């Protein structure tokens, strides 16, 4: 992950690490409706425990703002596009609210579907 992303004001500059942003995402995604868990990229069928959620999240930056990729497992029987849209919206809102940084894109990769419970 990148070393940091900056927010500047008249009082100075604040650097926010990609790991800190990934932690925000890691706390936000499991609370979204339809998410069973998160999975490491390319690892179908293996849910990650809370302490390893950063393996399911990639944070990058560009001139337009942050780009966040995340890998999820969605509950079977739900509309995947609707669940992904909810995740995108919620992640962008929480990251912008908590960091002051602009989120340019949130890419949701559905790694698997499974019954909840």
Which residue stretches match the model-derived regions?
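Contiguous, often N-terminal, cationic amphipathic patches that form binding interfaces
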Residues: 1-80, 85, 101-117
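Hydrophobic alpha-helical segments of small multi-pass membrane proteins
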Residues: 87-90
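Conserved amphipathic alpha-helical interaction elements at protein-protein interfaces in regulatory
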Residues: 93, 97-98
């Amino acid at each position: 992950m990148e070393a940091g992303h900056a927010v500047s004001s008249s009082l100075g500059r604040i650097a926010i690490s990609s790991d800190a942003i990934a932690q925000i995402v890691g706390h936000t995604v499991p609370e979204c409706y339809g998410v069973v868990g998160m999975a490491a990229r390319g690892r179908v069928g293996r849910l990650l425990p809370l302490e390893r959620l950063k393996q399911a999240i990639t944070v990058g930056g560009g001139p337009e703002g942050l780009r966040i990729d995340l890998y999820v497992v969605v509950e079977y029987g739900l509309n995947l596009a609707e669940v992904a849209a909810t995740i995108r919206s919620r992640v962008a809102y929480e990251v912008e609210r908590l960091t002051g940084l602009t989120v340019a894109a949130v890419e949701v990769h559905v790694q698997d579907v499974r019954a909840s419970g």
